[in-house]
Amino acid sequence: MEVEYGTLQDIGSWMELVRQVRWNFPGLETQAALEDHRRTVLRFMGEQRALCVKDGDKVIGVLLLSKKHNMICCLAVDPAHRRNGIASALLEKALLELDRSKNITVTTFRENDEKGVAPRGLYKRFGFTEGKLLVEFGYPVQEFVLRGKVQ
């Protein structure tokens, strides 16, 4: 499985995946929000901050990262391809792109939210620990933190 940078040629398939899983991402409920997200993905692609895994030409896993904020912004895998190591491969590549000497953050669902079981387990396996309780797009979430390594 190869993790690669998303390109303009991937945007259609990328957004198809986003539409398929948008119920898992607060803030993507409307067409306007999806269009705004598409613009964001294109910007991230142009800055090599958009990672993906493909099956042929079909995007089946995506990850957006912010080097400025040292964070994982979005991670999603096609439901038909879950439990095949795609999320782990994307996260491994992202951690190579981010500054490991500083804290790396990501927000995900809270502990008692059934949508949070898989992502929380993934982040914990990579060494992230539970952080602050937050609200994003009106939805309760929790920050996870991977502590920076002292050099």
Model-identified regions with their sequence ranges:
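Active-site beta-strand termini and strand-to-loop segments that position acidic
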Residues: K54-G56, L146-K149
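Conserved GNAT acetyl-CoA-binding A-motif
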Residues: L98-N112
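Conserved active-site alpha-helix within GNAT-family acetyltransferase domains
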Residues: S88, E111-K132
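Conserved N-terminal entry element of GNAT/NAT acetyltransferase domains
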Residues: M1-Q9, G148-Q151
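Acetyl-CoA-dependent GNAT
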Residues: L8-C74, D78-A80, L91-E92, E97
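A short, internal acetyl-CoA/4′-phosphopantetheine-binding micro-motif in the GNAT/acyltransferase core
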Residues: L75-I86, F109-N112
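Short acidic/glycine-enriched loop/turn segments that link adjacent beta-strands
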Residues: F137-V141
